């Protein structure tokens, strides 16, 4: 083999090595893009399912409220009452497994989780303390779907004696 042929083969070999490196880099980029695409599609799918679940669960909240009203009116120990209670607990359990949580009413009123439906003037407890839950509130994966309707304590208004202002300078 001549010197010229060796140079040509060496040059061709170098070009092929360069081409191989380019193709290898291209393949790595494609693989990374594909992985990112798969992750994005999976995230979008999870988000779509979550939004669909949120929509359905928000439509079921009035049903939960109706169950609670029925249970508050029923007589404990009655077979019908116990059956309704069992169905309510099963429904609530299924919804909780999907991400629904009842808003637990703490001691203080929180305008992001509570809706004040009544203000009760009292000095017995600290101001803005939740006194009673009128209707339960719910969250879905941390997002408030329905605020809890509550009665809130407020300080009594001071009834000031009516002041009769007498004009100091009467013009006649």
From Swiss-Prot:
Please state which protein family the record places this protein in: Belongs to the GrpE family.
The record's section on SUPFAM superfamilies has: Coiled-coil domain of nucleotide exchange factor GrpE, Head domain of nucleotide exchange factor GrpE
Keyword annotations of the record: Chaperone, Cytoplasm, Stress response
Q: What is one GO biological process annotated to this record?
A: protein folding
Gene Ontology CC entries for this record = cytoplasm
- A Pfam family that this protein carries is GrpE
Highest taxon above the source species: Bacteria
Q: What is this protein called?
A: Protein GrpE
Q: Assembly and interactions? A: Homodimer.
| Function text | Participates actively in the response to hyperosmotic and heat shock by preventing the aggregation of stress-denatured proteins, in association with DnaK and GrpE. It is the nucleotide exchange factor for DnaK and may function as a thermosensor. Unfolded proteins bind initially to DnaJ; upon interaction with the DnaJ-bound protein, DnaK hydrolyzes its bound ATP, resulting in the formation of a stable complex. GrpE releases ADP from DnaK; ATP binding to DnaK triggers the release of the substrate protein, thus completing the reaction cycle.
Report the HAMAP family cross-referenced here.
GrpE
Q: Name one GO molecular function term.
A: unfolded protein binding
Instruction: Give the source species.
Output: Thermotoga sp. (strain RQ2)
Q: Which PANTHER family match?
A: GRPE PROTEIN, GRPE PROTEIN HOMOLOG, MITOCHONDRIAL
């Amino acid at each position: 083999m001549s010197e010229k042929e060796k140079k040509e083969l060496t040059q061709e070999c170098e070009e092929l090595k360069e081409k191989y490196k380019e193709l290898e880099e291209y393949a790595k980029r494609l693989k990374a893009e594909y992985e990112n695409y798969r992750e994005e599609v999976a995230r979008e799918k999870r988000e779509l399912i979550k939004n669909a679940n949120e929509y359905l669960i928000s439509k079921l909240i009035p049903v939960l409220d109706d169950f609670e009203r029925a249970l508050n009116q029923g007589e404990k120990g009655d077979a019908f009452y116990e059956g309704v209670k069992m169905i309510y607990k099963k429904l609530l359990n299924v919804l909780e497994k999907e991400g629904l949580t009842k808003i637990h009413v703490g001691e203080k009123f929180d305008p992001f989780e509570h809706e004040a439906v009544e203000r009760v003037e009292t000095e017995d407890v600290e101001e803005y303390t939740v006194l009673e839950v009128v209707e339960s509130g719910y969250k879905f994966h941390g997002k408030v779907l329905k605020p809890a309707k509550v009665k809130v304590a407020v300080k009594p208004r001071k009834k000031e004696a009516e002041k009769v202002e007498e004009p100091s300078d009467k013009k006649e």
